[in-house]
Amino acid sequence: MDLNTLQDRFGAANAEPVHVGCSGATVVRLDRGSERLYYKAGPGVSDEADRLAWLGSVGFPCPQIVDRGNNWLLTTELPGRDASQDWPAADRPAVLAAIADGLRALDQLSGCPFPSPFPGRGDAVTHGDYAAPNVFIDPDTLRFCGILDLGRLGVGDRYLDLALMFKSLRGSLNPQYGGLPAARRFVELYGGDPDDPRIEHYITLDDSGDYMP
């Protein structure tokens, strides 16, 4: 669907493509009056919409569904800034703590009807792609305020999300946090063990895609 068609369909004054992630989905930012909305389309987006609907129904902070169809989704904008932004140095310890707080709150949810696509036993609600760009922080309070990109959300091993954020924080895309020491600190703030072998195990699985059915 081209940008003009999207604008007409949803009554938007402006439509701008957003380049995010590696999922292959099309994402377009739409401005409609005072609202900022996001249109997402591609394989698996209907599954993501189901997960987003469930997460919103239990009151966890995430984008709200405005409309949906066959492998497309229109959502509200999350408040705050994502954790991959260049936060002021003085704020970064609090941002790390907020990332850990958000994951702990997600893990403790109950009643999730979806399994994680990753192997490994556990009873935590896992995001499945808990990386810095998918976690939002309130810039005023420095508290966790939401998550997005939920296509892999499901019940599984809590070390999955610890591993994926560990990878995100120690990698070259988020040098502002200081690399490996920050990744280890995040796991400790959560209450985990940064030397647990499951961290490297899940990073390897994610990199290889071998968890996919």
Predicted regions and their residues:
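Regulatory N- and C-terminal appendages and interdomain linkers associated
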Residues: 1-10, 48, 208-213
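Active-site acidic catalytic loop and adjacent metal/ATP-binding pocket
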Residues: 26-31, 108-160
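Protein kinase-like catalytic domain
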Residues: 56, 103, 107-110, 170, ...
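Short pocket-lining segment of the protein kinase catalytic domain that shapes the ATP-binding cleft
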Residues: 73-81
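Conserved protein kinase catalytic core
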Residues: 82, 135, 155, 167, ...
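Active-site activation/catalytic loop segments of kinase-like enzymes and analogous catalytic loops
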Residues: 160-194, 205-213
